[in-house]
Regions:
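Long, low-complexity, charge-biased intrinsically disordered regions
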Residues: 1-331
């Protein structure tokens, strides 16, 4: 099979299986040209860094323009679903205005098309090598005297016998406080990898309004843990062997320390459910949670409106580099 539901399937020069929505994006750009009688202007980021489209006060679009706007958003949403997670935050933000979009919102959506036209070589490569985390410290805490006791993972009893090579899950998580300045809602951004292959991505406004970064990052960590548990059981039911623990990385050290230390306290009862959900997963050994610098966190791609220079060094090895990603870092 070489094409299915908008995805091209092929192998690159080193025989790595690749998935890329190139034909689908080409068709999107053709429809764009038919609609607006011009090609989109090339840009290197979906939306300008730090932009707040919710503050736009330009004129509302008429009915025909609104229908075009909704059609463009729908096309972009499918592009996200089939691999272009680099535009997901922008599409998520602009989807909020589908009911009553403005001229400024349409200009921003056109910019996303310009980004896709410029950065049209994005490809998900199925890299099956297990990532090496041997340099990470292995914390040794006794959780048995905590409120979680000797908690263990709930493993389904009706899953088939696992066969094949083992899979290691990696999760990158981030939150953007007050992403929407009108509602005060933060955005959760999560990127999931099986071995070295991106398999799922998430960018969505949080249900609650958090007043501090600590709270929004803990909500994001809790959502990531829920996803991790779901992925583990999905792979079990597919008969795929998985490692005992998943690796989760976040850039908020306070949240990481509060989650991984048994004697850590909580001063905000508002965060208590997220706090205990994450800590229980760590106490059971399902999750290993580590801190990384914010500039090295790929989840930034999914949590905020970013600039090219800010993100390229983490986006490039994920979507725009063929071969060994270590060579990409060396460059």
């Amino acid at each position: 099979i070489s094409y299915h539901l908008g995805m091209d399937f092929f192998r690159d020069e080193d025989k790595t299986l690749c998935m890329a929505p190139k034909k689908y994006i080409d068709k999107m750009l053709q429809n764009y040209e038919r609609t607006f009688k011009s090609k989109p202007q090339f840009v290197t980021s979906p939306i300008e860094k730090g932009d707040n489209p919710e503050l736009d006060t330009s004129e509302l679009l008429d009915d025909d323009q609104t229908q075009n706007y909704q059609s463009l958003i729908g096309a972009l949403q499918w592009a996200v679903s089939i691999g272009r997670f680099d535009i997901q935050t922008a599409v998520m933000s602009m989807s909020s205005f589908r009911a009553a979009p403005r001229i400024g919102h349409l200009k921003r959506v056109k910019r996303i098309f310009g980004y896709l036209a410029k950065m049209n070589e994005a490809t998900i490569r199925v890299r099956t090598e297990i990532p090496d985390y041997s340099d990470l410290p292995e914390p040794h805490y006794d959780w048995s005297r905590s409120v979680y006791g000797n908690v263990t993972e709930d493993i389904p009893l009706d899953a088939p016998k696992p066969l094949g090579k083992v899979v290691r899950f990696t999760h990158f998580v981030d939150a953007n406080l007050m992403h929407d300045v009108l509602t005060g809602k933060s955005v959760t951004g999560i990127l999931h990898l099986a071995n070295q292959t991106p398999i799922d991505w998430y960018s969505k406004k949080q249900a609650t309004v958090e007043t501090a970064t600590y709270g929004s990052e803990f909500v994001a960590a809790r959502i990531c843990v829920d996803h991790a548990v779901d992925l583990r059981n999905t792979f079990r039911y597919l008969g795929v062997p998985i490692e005992d623990s998943n690796y989760m990385f976040g850039d908020n050290k306070s949240v990481v320390d509060s989650s991984t230390t048994p004697h850590a306290g909580l001063n905000k009862r508002h965060n208590i459910l997220s706090f205990h959900r994450v800590r229980q997963a760590i106490a059971s050994g399902v999750i290993k949670f580590y801190h990384i610098p914010g500039e090295e966190n790929p989840a930034d791609i999914l949590s905020k409106h970013w600039g090219y220079s800010q993100i390229w060094h983490v986006l490039r090895p994920l979507l725009f580099w063929g071969g060994d990603t270590a060579d990409c870092i060396d460059e």
